[in-house]
Amino acid sequence: MARGAARKLVLSGVLAGGSGAAPLTGRAVKSWRVAVPADFVLWRDVCSYGYFLLEPNLWLPGSGGVWAAGVGGVFRRIVDLGAAGPARLEVTQPEGKGADLSVVADTALSGAARHEATAQLTRMLRLDEAPHNIAAFHSLDRRYKKSGRGRLFRSATFFEDVIKTVTNCNVTWLGTMSMNRRLCGAFGAGGAFPTPARLAAVRPAALRAQCGVGYRDARIVQLAEMFESGAVDEAWFADSSQPDDVVRDALIELPGIGPYAAANILQLLGRYGHVPLDTESVRHGRTVLAMRGSSESIMKRVGKHFAGYGEQRFRSYWFELWECYELLRGPAWTWEREKVGATFTAAAIKKAMAAKSGESGCKFNAPLKRKAAGAAARKRPARAASR
């Protein structure tokens, strides 16, 4: 099933009421339910990619008791619903895996507004990704079959994903968090992420002064102008029939988008056959994959290491990297944005790694090394057979 078809099924389930859900028509209400794929788990699939720590997103961890039942945590998001204005949504999954999401807004929303809010949630949580696509990933990389990991959190719109990626280049994670917080506070309706129209109307100098975006100021405004004018056709970029290389080339033509940013935006579009290589890739190559040499050579070797996963290579790379972060900071679904998110600096990670290495006289990454070695061994026969 194509991604677009899966999305249509999810939304039609909600429109028809889903399993006990209120149809998105009639009088304005504050709460409704959203049907999800059978394998979907809110706490696992929200806390799967770093953007869940960036405003206007907020994850509120639950207590240990509800985690044991598999139903913990609240996902909170301020959404811009156009003419309906901004709304703060609180999303939970009270009945656990595969059960409907419960969505509660801070204001009563019309059927049209709830439909738009649901569409944004669908994109963020990748509810339009069919379970068989996740199963295809697990068949290639069995390390993540038991946990069910496969979906990667993203933004409510393509525009937001592009801008968040621009704010994540050549800067610390603290800087990325700060830029997104200030963008939402200064130019977002009610704290939502700013629309293309809003940012297109801002002078680059004002954007730099109010949001600390530095050299990105003019590029962000240019991107906003292109999205607002229709020069960037979101439907074309989201069309799965377009070859990855063609989409990548088109991304690189956009202001502020280089090879790393393009590879990252590709995975945000659901194209997992590319790995965005950066300094974190080098650190991972050295600490987990036991690679030696210059940063440039390690970066290339990391790319080659995951090439055997083909169209799923980003997911294999990312979840391996994510597990490393979790060994340092605990399971991602227990992270609090202002406490844990703010500690993702090179110095803090290095210090945490050193502390972990001293525990019980063993390296903190030994389990990851064993998993990585086992995965590499399983890939070798497949490569030989394909020659």
Would you name each region that the model predicts?
Residues 2-387:
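HhH-family (HhH-GPD) DNA N-glycosylase catalytic core used in base-excision repair
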